[in-house]
Amino acid sequence: MASRASIAVTRLSRVAFAGLAVLIITAGCHRAPKSTASTELEVEGREIFRYDTFGNEQFWTDSAGLVELVDKRIEPPEALRLGLKVDMEKLDLAKFVGNNPFSTGGTKELLKRDAVVGLKATFSEDGGLQKVGITCALCHSTVDDALLPGIGHRLDGWPNRDLEVGKILSMLPIFTPEQKKILESWPKGTYDPRFNFDGKSTPLVLPPAYGLAGVANETYTAEGPISYWNAYVAITQMHGRGTFKDPRIGVNIVQTPDMVTPKLPALRAYQHSLPAPKSSYDDSEAARGKVVFDANCARCHVGGNLTDNNNGVLHAPSATGMDPAYAERTPQKKYRTTPLRGLAKHPPYFHDGSAKTLEDVINHYAKVLNLQLTEKQRKDLEEYLKSL
């Protein structure tokens, strides 16, 4: 089935760009979400989150061939089909109307304006694309589609569940044919943060980076606090220049100068400033659902952040009916109770996306934990989960 972005691009190619002016005017009525960054440290962290590559051009340009891929193969229609997002606030909307942004060379023009969310490029004096790196926002920001599907205002902290990470990686020349087949099999909005170490493939749903304040460990398997995971990803996955050591998993990377560690406090401050988005729900049903939740779910979902992991608790996969394959690749071999924040805004659920809806989540636990819930109780519980 074609994506909303690809359908929009096809339609757009059939209309005169003068007609796009109507969309521009309409989009102008949609205000950009107000930034949550208020302190100097949070503002610094926002810039890091959005635009800092941590020097990873050393890998993506010098080794992986991302420049050639972007320069020769990925034009805007393909970029949107692959789930890349465009920040409309970086566009000159008058020129956007007057010039076809989906023409040959359009991707470079978007990169020159820092408009492709999560990609950072540098250009030569004659306009040639020299280097490309990636930022945190590539996977952990999306847009509100205010202009077109895939083009709108930034939503930092929202996971990009449209991003075809595996397909993009499979287009790079550094992988073997066997590896490319594995990468191409990853569902959109997923990524395996250990594939480059052990070659196994259990892709995880990209998690939200909002609502993290007060959460002790921000990974499905609770390896460490948010700055631990930020460092792990920045250095071992994004291939930034820095130092990361964890003897539990046999990683000892030392690169100087360290372009990651000094930035971790500001990055954490910005992520902690990102609130979980609110959803609509039925007040009466949610109130009844809270009673159901307290009686059946609050054994693990405890405290203000609704996770017993803040008390150091982890759960064997068999205890909650989770697929053990990913946990077995981690030091703890267990899963954390996921904090419940903005749930309705980031389906699918569980580490592997195996629950497509909140109803699926409830039915899963009702079966695994033998919860004797009526259909009405399940519906009320779903409304309560939407309220979190």
Segments predicted by a language model, with ranges:
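N-terminal secretory signal peptides that target proteins for export/translocation
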Residues: 1-11
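N-terminal Sec-pathway targeting helices
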Residues: 11-14, 30-32
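Bacterial N-terminal signal peptides
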Residues: 15-26
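Electron-transfer interface patches adjacent to heme c in soluble/periplasmic c-type cytochromes
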Residues: 29-46, 51-137, 141-149, 153-265, ...
